[in-house]
Design a protein with these regions (language model features):
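TerminUS-proximal long segments
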Residues: 2-4, 259-317
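Internal mixed beta-strand/loop scaffold within catalytic domains of large alpha/beta enzymes
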Residues: 51-128
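Hydrophobic, aromatic-enriched interface-forming segments
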Residues: 150, 154-200
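Glycine-rich, often proline-containing surface loops adjacent to acidic residues and nearby aromatics
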Residues: 63-64, 92-95, 124-133, 179-197, ...
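An amphipathic alpha-helical core segment
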Residues: 165, 169-187, 219-264
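Gly/Pro-rich turn-and-neighbor structural signature
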Residues: 5-83, 191, 195-227, 231-241
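Short conserved micro-motifs at the rims of enzyme active sites and ligand-binding pockets
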Residues: 78-80, 197-198, 253-259, 277
Length: 317
């Protein structure tokens, strides 16, 4: 957080997020052939939301790309737990959040969000990132995802990608399962480095790299043949997604605590999910390979860039 004289401009941030929402919805709708719905939902104190939801498409079974601009008299607990000195203060926030659940199990789920808070009169910070959750991972896809993530961070220092990558691994982790949600990406919070202008530039760079990170992967996997076995595994892995969003995610808790429209808060949940008691993958199967080799933090750029396979998890060795 900062109280820098480099004055924050919530209007500029809000405008960028709204433009990014339109760009991403248009690109994904072009791939699927079905448009996103559009709503304008007024909020208290002059705030508003624009949820755009995709449902029942050919490529995507469900998805949402949502913009919100909130104004409140007291910062919700989920937004101040890392900075308790801000609890109870008035705030203004804008955010874009997206999640796409594909039908094809070989197409990874992707999630991204960017947010900006002003608390009181001078304290502000950015947050967000993007992450990838494959059921049947391909090394070239994981490598491309992290190379693009690194490219997004490169103008802001060589240390930025490793830091945001490590924070992503730590955040998108299910401790009750002892596994990561997917293969990671970028995550940052309370970001003010370099003042508002540079922090906003980094936020825009990450936002501008979302489609270049995901569309090539989508294009490679969209026509991959799949059957009942792969679909069953997709529904099983979606359960992990639901567990994280409902039990762990700070964004979900913030949405519930801030009084946001419940349909928008829970729009990220997958449309169909299965849980199986004590399910175990077949030894030697692709399903076991995901569990044993991918659901742990790894240095993907060094590992896959050198042509090496991902390491087996320590708990299964």
């Amino acid at each position: 957080m900062t109280t820098s004289t480099d004055q924050p401009d919530v209007t500029a941030v809000s405008s960028y997020f709204e433009t990014l929402q339109a760009t991403i919805c248009d690109a994904l709708a072009e791939v699927d052939g079905q448009p996103f719905s559009t709503e304008e939902v007024p909020g208290p104190n002059g705030g508003h939301a624009r949820p755009r939801v995709h449902s029942g498409g050919v490529v995507f079974e469900k998805g949402a790309v949502q913009f919100t601009h909130s104004v409140g008299s007291a910062l919700p607990a989920a937004a101040s737990e890392r900075n308790p000195e801000l609890a109870g203060q008035g705030f203004e926030a804008c955010a874009i959040s997206m999640i796409m659940h594909p039908r094809n199990p070989y197409v990874p789920v992707f999630h991204a969000n960017l947010r900006f808070f002003i608390v009181g009169s001078t304290t502000w910070y950015f947050g967000g990132g993007f992450d990838l959750t494959p059921c049947y991972p391909f090394d070239e896809d994981v490598l491309h995802w992290h190379q693009t993530a690194r490219d997004a961070c490169a103008p802001f220092g060589e240390d930025v990608y490793p830091r945001l990558k490590a924070d992503c691994d730590a955040y998108f982790y299910l401790p009750h399962r002892e596994e990561t949600r997917g293969v990671g990406g970028l995550f940052f919070d309370d970001w003010t480095e370099g003042g508002f202008t540079q922090s906003f530039a980094m936020c825009r760079s990450i936002g501008d790299h979302i489609l270049p990170a995901y569309l090539p992967i989508l294009g490679r996997r969209i026509a991959h043949v799949w059957g009942e076995r792969e679909e069953a595994f997709l529904l099983y892995r979606r359960g992990r997604y639901a567990e994280f969003n409902l039990a762990i995610d700070r964004g979900t808790r913030y949405g519930l605590q801030s009084g946001r429209r419940i349909e928008s808060v829970l729009a990220s949940l997958p449309p169909r999910v299965n849980w199986h008691y004590n399910w175990q993958p077949e030894p030697g199967s692709p399903e076991e390979y995901l569990t044993e080799h991918y659901l742990k933090p790894q240095d993907w750029l060094s590992l896959l860039g050198a042509g090496k396979p991902p390491a087996q998890s320590k708990t299964s060795e």
